[in-house]
Each structure stands twice: as C-alpha cells, then as structure tokens.
Amino acid sequence: MTDPAPIETTNLGRAEDTAIAWSRPRDVLTAPSPPDHPGGYFPSYLGTVRPDGRPHATGIGVRWHDGDLYFLSGPSTRKSRNLAANPACTIAMRLPDGPDVVLGGDAAPIDDPAILEAVGALVRQSGWPVEVTAGGFTAPFGPRGGDPPPWRLYRFVFHAAIGQGGEGATRWRFAR
C-alpha cells in the first residue's frame, strides 16, 4: 500500500487561514526517526470506548509503515479489551513543530509475518530489542506498567484526521 492521500481537505480555521497541507504531519510520521526524538517516538494517545460506553485514553508508541500506524498492546490491557469489543478509536499526537493531529479510524490485531517483521525492525531501531513470535512480539523488558510479553501488533487504519496549530486548523478525509 502507498501512503494515503486525502480525498477532501477542509479549512476549519478563520476565513483568512489557509488549509494545512497533509504533507506536514505525514512527513513527520514517515520519517525514520522524528526530529528531536531519537527513540523515534513522540507523545501519542489512543482513545477507545469501554464496553459501558465510557471513554478510555492511554499513551502509546506508534510506528508508521506502508501507510498505516502500528502500536503494541498486551492481551489483557484495557485498550486491547476495548478494541476487541469496538475497533473504532482515535490516536492523538503532538508532532514536533506542529500541527497537533487527531486521527480517527479502526484498529485490529495483525498476524501477517511480513508486517510483523517490518514493524519489528522499525521498533528495534528505537533501541527496544523486540523479537517476532507467532502473532506478536516479545522482548527482555517491556513498557512500564504494561502487560508482560507477548504483545500483539495492532494496525490503525485512519479515515479522517484533524490538524491544529498556530496557523489554523484543517480536517482531512481519506478513502480507505
């Protein structure tokens, strides 16, 4: 798959503002190691819905691969249980030099060995020595407060995004 291009771009700011180009957040997300973030990660937050309808948010590390975002989660975490019941979710992130971006879409676990290997290589570049296992990853250590290994890899396919920064606000829609 190639990187998605918006099918619709809408300026949400003042009339005199111009729409923010999708290339601004895309270029940061697709960079091998984001500027000023040598580990490759920058603040990102996953928003899901609990079975009772209440919202849930948690910090995650994301990686861009082949047009989608990927993140890891243990099978018994609240986010994994929420996504099993309802894959609709958001990822919000503060990108270096803006704009701040919120993406809306769906997340599902991935078992494809080729994708696991490709994303595993990206994660290892950040210094986390993950190894691919059947359907996920393991490592000698994990995130603080997280489930022990193995961790599932989730693919987040976004359908819409909103970017907001000092120069205005823009909504992008994608046909995916």
Kindly label every feature range from the protein language model.
Residues 1-24, 99-176:
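Charged, gly/pro-rich active-site loop segments
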Residues 16, 21-26, 74-94, 130-133:
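Short, solvent-exposed cationic patches
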Residues 16-60:
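An N-terminal domain-cap segment
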Residues 29, 83, 122-123:
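A generic structural signal for nonpolar/aromatic side chains embedded in well-ordered alpha-helices
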Residues 35, 51, 94-96, 145:
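Residues embedded in well-ordered secondary-structure elements
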Residues 39, 84, 96, 146-149:
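A generic structural signal for short, non-catalytic loop/turn and secondary-structure boundary residues
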Residues 41-75, 81-83, 89-94, 101-103:
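Short beta-strand segments
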